[in-house]
Amino acid sequence: MKKMNYLLPEESGEMTLSGITTLRKIEQKLRNLFESQNYQEVMPPNFEYVELYTGLDAGFEQEKMFQFINHEGKSIALRYDFTVPLARNFALSELTEARYSYFGKVFRKEKRHKGRRTESYQVGTELLGLSEVTGDQEILGLTFMSLEALTLKNTIVEIGSAAFYKRLCELSGGDAQLFSELLEKKSLSGMKAFVDKHEMIGAPRDLLLALMTTTDLPTMKKLVLATGDEKLSQALEMLEALNLPDKTAICQIHYDFAMVPAMGYYTGLMFQVYVEGVAQATISGGRYDKLLKQFGKTTGSIGFCVHMDNVVKGLNND
């Protein structure tokens, strides 16, 4: 008789019984919270046409999708992302404003040594139809309430701007890919070599060298003002309009001016929440106004995602 192989494939995600119990408890807390804030739970399909993701200017990597051919000969992918299907549904509706919540898994091919899961469980919200500052403040407020419900300790909320990042890339001397990699790695020595290579001097040089070490808005505003760049100033003005404190009762709030967008469709505010002892973000979110335009609807949109596997890790570390 052939010997059975009982090993799980690398792509599988598995959780202990105690982990499942913890997950279900916090899942219910978040569901109750979202319902209390009028976020309607929706359940997008597990399968989508590959073209839904690749046909958008959203930075999706097709090689990370789990794909197969259906009975009609069309390319299908396991759910790669929640935001895109929900944005599509909203754009095709007659609604002018919507609040959605979701609970489910996404599937992306990831290398295990990077600490990311190929099969990950996500809980999240999408707010569609509100203007930038109003929508940003509501989603950040809901994020803080979610942190309180999760009872995570020693949390840091990092605030960034996709508009700020994209303008920096435009000013990077035609070497945007390397520039982005340096930001993502937080490589101070690499950035020093970068500005030397491009012979940057004065205010632009000072700005780039300060990106990874500056965590307060007033200091960064002075550095940007010295460059005279209007787009960079506008991006910081949007962050300033949020009027965020340095900390709340449940978390510290830092600015990360070197933050690289986790999703290619982000256009404005970005944020990530980290908890002590967990390398990856427990919550991530951002504004994605241009995504809806690709579906023919022009309005504000922002959301966030709770990475439940990382939350369970954080709670186990407490």
Swiss-Prot record:
UniProt main location, coarse: cytoplasm
Compartments, record wording: Cytoplasm
InterPro entries documented for this protein: aa-tRNA-synth_II (IPR006195), aa-tRNA-synth_II/BPL/LPL (IPR045864), HisRS-like_core (IPR041715), HisRS/HisZ (IPR004516), HisZ (IPR004517)
CDD domains, per the entry: HisRS-like_core (cd00773)
Pfam families the record matches: tRNA-synt_His
BP term (GO), one: L-histidine biosynthetic process
Record flagged with keyword Amino-acid biosynthesis: yes
Leftover remarks: This function is generally fulfilled by the C-terminal part of HisG, which is missing in some bacteria such as this one.
PANTHER family: ATP PHOSPHORIBOSYLTRANSFERASE REGULATORY SUBUNIT, HISTIDYL-TRNA SYNTHETASE
Role according to the record: Required for the first step of histidine biosynthesis. May allow the feedback regulation of ATP phosphoribosyltransferase activity by histidine.
Quaternary structure, from the entry: Heteromultimer composed of HisG and HisZ subunits.
Name under which the protein is recorded: ATP phosphoribosyltransferase regulatory subunit
Organism from which the protein derives: Lactococcus lactis subsp. cremoris (strain MG1363)
Classification lineage: Bacteria, Bacillati, Bacillota, Bacilli, Lactobacillales
Gene from which the chain derives: hisZ
